Amino acid sequence: MHNANHPHGNGHPAEKKGMGAHSGAMNMPRTLEDGSPACRLIAWEVTRSCNLACKHCRAEAHTEPYPGELSTQEAKALIDTFPEVGNPIIIFTGGDPMMRADLYELIRYATGLGLRCVLSPNGTLITGQNAVQIREAGVQRCSISIDGPSAELHDEFRGVPGAFEQSMRGIEFLKQAGVEFQINTTVTRDNLPYFKDIFKLCENLGAAAWHIFLLVPTGRAAQLGAQVITAEEYEEVLNWFYDFRKTTSMHLKATCAPHYYRIMRQRAKEEGLPVTPDNFGMDAMTRGCLGGIGFCFISHTGQVQPCGYLELDCGNVRDTRFPEIWRKSEYFRQFRTPEEYDGKCGHCEYHNVCGGCRARGFTMSGSHMAEEPLCTYQPRKKPAADRK
């Protein structure tokens, strides 16, 4: 699940008030001693192996073991470096991370260093026994991907009959063990008409949060062109999402949808509502795309990337210490300078809170600095060349 298909794991997890994966987020340092931004979230693909065959899997994961995965010793050495870049939340993702034999050992090790850990399995491998192991290892939240309100739609998308029922059973085991969970849903043309039904399912299950993901056409998802909704439809969906979040106490978040943060500010201004944590929670304190800015992805072989959808090699932890990659990667430097983005994103007045999806721009154009292709907004500011 948010494993290979959602490389951000818990979708910049659980930014809600009180307990949860972002509990204490207010206390995260904003910058490091050298002036680099602190890392808030690390999605770590501890294995690429997965027992499902999801149509939108960016990793095109399969069940067999992958060569070159970090050893237990290498993994622990990597974990030792995480506190040097701030106080990041560690998202154990995959593939399905539960297919890694030493998973609980690694989570316990990270928890022992004071790191907050969340887990992103697809849910089908969760049992009563390992749900207790998940809790005892120190996992603060699990995210489970559900892409339809029933087995028919979900199983077709996941590529394995019975996946829906297995995930439902896994969620029940998490509940029995007292492990908090959220639901992640990828927006496609097929499931969009059922979004209210999916939300109702989230409510009935007792999910702490519902995160929707805008599809990034990489990996197997590159073959899903017909499932990608248009820029105009995304605008409509995100405006609906803004309104819908007011109807529930459940935490709702749009992920891989940086333009939501522009829409949120536009709508809040229309309503005369200050964009503050009291009114919008952590959404008021973050930006749309955190890739290379407050978030990064580490692959199963140790390659550091801005995100799981964007396979830019920023360095490998086997060759260079992770904190050095975080501080000095040229790709990260570029991402941290939004006025250098190409097209309208570079001169948009919302580039500090949105930034566009670098991965979608790269997929569509071949440039990681390209403008967000699924955005209808036309900036009020003119490009610098036009202002001369």
Swiss-Prot record:
GO molecular function: 4 iron, 4 sulfur cluster binding; metal ion binding; oxidoreductase activity
PROSITE patterns referenced in this protein's UniProt entry, alphabetically: RADICAL_SAM (PS51918)
Radical SAM core domain mapped to chain residues: 34-257
Summary of the function given for this chain in its UniProt record: Involved in siroheme-dependent heme b biosynthesis. Catalyzes the conversion of Fe-coproporphyrin III into heme by the oxidative decarboxylation of two propionate side chains.
Protein name (database record): AdoMet-dependent heme synthase
InterPro entries: 4Fe4S-binding_SPASM_dom, Aldolase_TIM, Cmo-like_SPASM_containing, Elp3/MiaA/NifB-like_rSAM, PqqE-like, Radical_SAM_PqqE_MftC-like, rSAM, rSAM_AhbD_hemeb
Catalysis performed (reactions): Fe-coproporphyrin III + 2 S-adenosyl-L-methionine = heme b + 2 5'-deoxyadenosine + 2 L-methionine + 2 CO2
Annotated spans, Disordered: 1-29
Protein family according to the UniProt entry: Belongs to the radical SAM superfamily.
Taxonomic lineage from the root: Bacteria, Pseudomonadati, Thermodesulfobacteriota, Desulfovibrionia, Desulfovibrionales
GO biological process, one term: heme biosynthetic process
Comp. bias (Low complexity): 1-12
Keyword terms of this UniProt record: 4Fe-4S, Heme biosynthesis, Iron, Iron-sulfur, Metal-binding, Oxidoreductase, S-adenosyl-L-methionine
